[in-house]
Amino acid sequence: MKFPIYLDYAATTPVEFEVMKEMMNYLTLEGEFGNPASRSHKFGWKAEEAVDIARNQIAELIHADSREIIFTSGATESNNLAIKGIAEFYKKKGNHIITCSTEHKATLDTCRYLENKGFDITYLNPLQNGTINIYELQEKIQKNTILVSIMHVNNEIGVIQDIHKISKICQSNNILFHVDAAQSIGKININLKQLKIDLMSFSAHKIYGPKGIGGLYIRRKPRVRLSAQIHGGGHEKGMRSGTLPVHQIVGMGIAYKIAKIKINSDFNYIKHLRNRLWNGIKNIEEIHLNSNFENTVPHILNVSFNYVEGESLIMALKNLAVSSGSACTSSSLEASYVLRSLGLKDELAHSSIRFSLGRFTTKEEIDYTIQLIHQSINRLRNLSPLWEMFKSGVDMNNVNWTHN
């Protein structure tokens, strides 16, 4: 085994060897390093051809038309382009947008930005299992609602939203529907020919492709319009200017091609490992499962260990690469806003650990992780006066704490 063991695949993934190998062919003088916008010579033609092939590979994974794929720098930019772009283009039609309080910061902060610009944003609170209340969504729709933006799979707890039902509600009310699919693409099957989704954000680095490249699906029929957020040479049909990074796009295409082949085998393999991990730790006293197995991807297992501080546990698990929440917010010492939205008390939210598994995780790594968790929890709790009080029968909910 190689240490530390990587169990943070929801943050990013290692690049597949085949992806890296193909990317190298588009970087140096010996390869096809041209600008795809250079249409007057072979270097540009070859680069453009490579981009077209990758665009098709991406479209095939999600069953879309390749002309509906726009390249961006990643899912964060795609979310910004989708939400701001729709808000600006359709502002004469309405200024109301609906999203969920457990969305990724790329969506929440974009919506807060629009609030400061005069837009009306409704933040749905999730049910206890993390899904949105479909009936509440219907109730919150107004005459001036122009967009609903909901993530497919939550990045902290792995819950899967019913985007099929949501899309039907949006379609029946003539409202555009945007989906953040950064955590679902390549993990569960998505067929955009069957789903009435208007915009979908995704990236490469969550499914064994390079960082710094992503995409936005924009439906052609019926046509969805949006305002560009980056202006310049009019690349990507005028929706996202900037010279295309051919090597990254090629890498993304290969990663999506591999994902199409391995999606089902990956799912079953990772589910087996997730179950092995949970079965190995579920009998630990005062452990709380924050990921509902019935409606989540197996790639993410979020648990809380009561009377153990999450940051302390992460330091104790120094041979494991895990996180206490989203990689984008794990530097904050505040309790996870996602877990608090589910109704968890701060104590449990603070003691949460996200284990995220991937294609290269092994059974031996899971078994080592189980052993290390048991040892670390026992050691930390033996040092905790709160654990001692709990074991002595003190009702912790009735303790009157004095704050200095």
From Swiss-Prot:
NCBIfam families: IscS, PRK02948.1, PRK14012.1
Molecular function per GO: 2 iron, 2 sulfur cluster binding; cysteine desulfurase activity; metal ion binding; pyridoxal phosphate binding
GO CC annotation: L-cysteine desulfurase complex
Pathway membership, UniProt: Cofactor biosynthesis; iron-sulfur cluster biosynthesis
Subunit field text: Homodimer. Forms a heterotetramer with IscU, interacts with other sulfur acceptors.
Family named by the database record: Belongs to the class-V pyridoxal-phosphate-dependent aminotransferase family. NifS/IscS subfamily.
Pfam families reported in the protein's UniProt record: Aminotran_5
Chain's gene name: iscS
Name under which the protein is recorded: Cysteine desulfurase IscS
